[in-house]
Amino acid sequence: IAGHQQALFNNLQEALVSPAAQQKAEAVGAKGIRIVGCTCVGQDFQVRKDACTDAFCGHAGNNYTSEAVLSTGCIDLVLSEFNCTIPGIEPICDALQIPQICLDDVAKKKNAEYMPYSFAKKKEISEYVIDKAVASYAGRKDCDFNAANCAKALESVANPALREALAKVLLEVKKENGAAGRTNPMAQHG
């Protein structure tokens, strides 16, 4: 998720830990569905961690790290509601078959589905997002992903600690799955 308004995502995080969502995830081979926060809403979730459900698994960085996070192949859906979801992620999402949903027209991206948020329809929106994420995971879980492509993405990451952490993870994945590529890591981690 990316944006500024944690309140919009509160119902979603509660829905993600429901038995119904868990069953949907398990039906396609996932262990569950998690929220990875980027940008301001990720920081907000991090600050409110004690009030969050287990669906929130952490803050991955600001809007400039979104491209690196997407290029890992671990993300199955981008959900945004404000303009800090930077333009430029569209080609990455297209190449990795990651659907995008925007809840506000300020966040609308090329090739993204626009679904205006409505408090009255929050449950339906959350269910739709869950179904879309599950379908994306099911379609992507066995796809090949060439870890060599990540080296180019890492060259643009400015923070040395972040670059080192991502490189370490990618090297571990490469060792486990061979030099030719790897499958979506979420297939193993849920």
Residues covered by each model-derived region:
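Metallocofactor- and cofactor-centric catalytic cores in central/energy metabolism, strongly enriched
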Residues: 1-190
